[in-house]
Structures are given as C-alpha cells and as structure tokens.
C-alpha cells in the first residue's frame, strides 16, 4: 500500500508509491525538491540577470530623457543661462564655466551625438554645471551637501514606518475584530488621510513653537562641531531630525498597516495555517512561521513602489521644517528659476527611486522562489 504523509503547509501529500495525474491525464510538474539543484540555481541566476538588465536599461533611458529635456527647449538654453548669470552677478562666467554649461545643455556647433557623449562625460565626472542662484557654486557641490540629509531622513523613516506598520498590521489581521483592531483601525484611517504638509505644520506648532521641546528648523546644532564620530553631534542630528522623522513615519506606517492587515485576514483562513494550529504549534509559531511569512510578500513589493511617494512627502516636510535636504534645495531652485539645479535634483531623485526598486526586487526574489522560476 502507498503511504500517505501530511504537511503543515500543503495538507495531504501525494502517496509515495502512487502515480498521480492531473485532470488531463498528464503527470504534474515535479515539486521543487525534485528539480536538480543546478537547474534551480540556473533559473535564479537568469532571474537576477534579467532584473539587473532591466534596471540598467531604465537608468539609461532616464539619463537620456534628462539629456533631451533642454534640447527640446526653444532657442539656446546654455546661452540663456549665461546671460542670466551675467545679469545676476554683474560679471560673465569664466570660459571653463561656460564650457561646463555647454557640455550639460548642448553646443549648437556640435551634432547631437557629440553633445550626448559630452553629456555622459559630464555625468561620469559629476559635473552638472554651476548654480544660477548660488553662482559660481557648482551644482555638484550643492547636491553633495543636501543629498546625505535626504538619504538619512528617507532611509530611516521608510524602514521604520515599514517595520511598525507591518508588525501592527500582522497583529491586527491575526485577530481581526478584537478591541485593539476596533480602536486602532479608525484612528489610523483618520491619520492616513492627513496631508503631509498639514501634519508637519501641526507637529511644528505643538512641539517646536508652543512646547519648545524641539528645534524649529535645521539639521543639527550649529554650535556643535560637524564631526560624525562626535557623540554630541549625533545627538544633535537626532534632536533636529526628530520632528521631520516623526511626521514621515506617522504618514507612512498607516499604508503598510492596512496592507498587511488585509492580507493577514485572508491568510489566517488558509489550510496550511489551520493545519499548523491543529498540530498544536504555538500562536507565535503559526503567526511568524506560517501566516505572517506569506502575507509579508506584498509589503516587500510595495516598499519599492512607495519610494516615489515617500520622496514627494519628504520634499514637503523638508520645506516646512527647513531641513537642508534635496526637498528644500528643490524648492529654493524652483523659486529662483535655477534650471541646472532643478534638472540635477530631479535626476538624482529618479536615480534614488530606481536603486530602491532594484534592491526591493532583489529581496523579493530571495524571499519568494516562484518569482525566480517565472
């Protein structure tokens, strides 16, 4: 007689000695364990190579589009910028500065291919021309001053919001309808509807203006030496970044909470979860090892897709708190009509989004083997 075995994840397994067929009379595909390891590894390698190729092409297209934007503008953008700099400063740019502007915005005496090669040369040398509003400061210098603050703010708050929202959503979906779920769900729904700038203004008014617990603007105390290995400087950064960070986390975690909760409500009724409970596993083992593990995958995918929205929220929050990141720099560039700075900031934000999506795609492929086999 054939022996029937049971699995906590899949219910009743196929009899070991019985030949099984599907509805069409064909033998089904062998399970993953029956596929030789070298074939599974080859499929995984192809998946990662395809994803790397996709994001390389995406980056190439984004850079090419950024190259074409000023070429579609009427007239000669480089000459217009040169005239504007002369009007603002009272002195014309130096020949080297004019050459830098020409490399980035085009030289009519060159063909498009020559301009494109010069553009790539400028990018590889991190040469984006000079800022119009802060002439003669190079755009790259301003980017390098603002980019670390934005990466610190966006990176820390995105991860923190994702972790908080995912864990709370898993707990609420594990026992839907309990007291915690009934009270917390309406509150988070209301919080999720708040615009980022409105919440930032409320937080600023309460904690910085009325209570005076935290600073109203800036990224660190100017009286503390700018040294990363200085404990007082680190504490100053945490103090000045607390209000922007709390605002972004409060805005961001609600989406992850509802996403995880909705998937968990469905997952807890799956057969493999019910069987795990029937086998006597503890609630924590079933929650973490079976239900939450499978419900987590949509949140991993959504993490990359949310980067664009997080950047948009960060721009508003940085502006409200005068936090010296890319958002505040973009607002200042728009106000001053500083096109070289605007164009470079948009390129950097696009690149950050692409990198975040790439990392999330790689993590998703490691968590779910089915994506590597598709």
Give residue ranges: language-model regions.
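Membrane-water interface segments at the C-terminal ends of transmembrane alpha-helices
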Residues: 65-72, 118-121, 187-218, 247-249, ...
């Amino acid at each position: 007689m054939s022996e029937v075995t049971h699995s906590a994840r899949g219910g009743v397994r196929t009899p070991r000695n019985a030949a099984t067929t599907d509805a069409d009379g064909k033998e089904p595909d062998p399970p993953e364990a029956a596929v030789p390891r070298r074939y599974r590894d080859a499929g995984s390698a192809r998946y990662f190579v395809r994803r790397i190729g996709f994001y390389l092409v995406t980056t190439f297209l984004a850079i090419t589009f950024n190259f074409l934007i000023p070429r579609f503008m009427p007239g000669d953008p480089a000459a217009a910028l040169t005239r504007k700099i002369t009007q603002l400063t009272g002195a014309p740019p130096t020949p080297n500065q004019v050459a830098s502007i020409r490399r980035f915005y085009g030289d009519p005496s060159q063909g498009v291919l020559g301009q494109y090669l010069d553009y790539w040369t400028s990018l590889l040398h991190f040469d984006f021309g000079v800022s119009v509003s802060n002439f003669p400061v190079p755009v790259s210098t301003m980017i390098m001053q603002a980019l670390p603050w934005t990466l610190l703010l966006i990176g820390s708050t995105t991860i923190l919001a994702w972790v908080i929202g995912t864990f709370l959503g898993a707990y609420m979906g594990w026992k839907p309808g309990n007291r915690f779920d009934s009270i917390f769900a309406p509150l988070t729904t209301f919080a999720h509807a708040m615009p980022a700038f409105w919440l930032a203004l409320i937080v600023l008014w309460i904690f910085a203006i009325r209570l005076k617990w935290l600073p109203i603007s800036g990224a660190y105390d100017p009286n503390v030496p700018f040294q990363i290995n200085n404990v007082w400087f680190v504490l100053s950064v945490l103090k000045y970044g607390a209000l922007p960070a709390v605002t972004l986390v409060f805005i961001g975690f609600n989406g992850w909470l509802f996403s995880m909760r909705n998937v968990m409500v469905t997952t807890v009724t799956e057969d493999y979860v019910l069987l795990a409970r029937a086998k006597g596993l503890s609630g924590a083992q079933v929650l973490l090892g079976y239900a939450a593990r499978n419900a987590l995958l949509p949140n991993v995918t959504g993490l990359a897709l949310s980067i664009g929205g997080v950047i948009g929220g960060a721009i508003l929050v940085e502006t409200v708190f005068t936090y010296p990141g890319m958002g505040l720099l973009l607002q200042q560039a728009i106000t001053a009509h500083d096109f070289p700075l605007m164009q470079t900031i948009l390129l950097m934000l696009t690149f950050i989004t692409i990198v975040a999506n790439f990392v999330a795609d790689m993590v998703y492929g490691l968590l779910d083997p089915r994506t590597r086999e598709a």
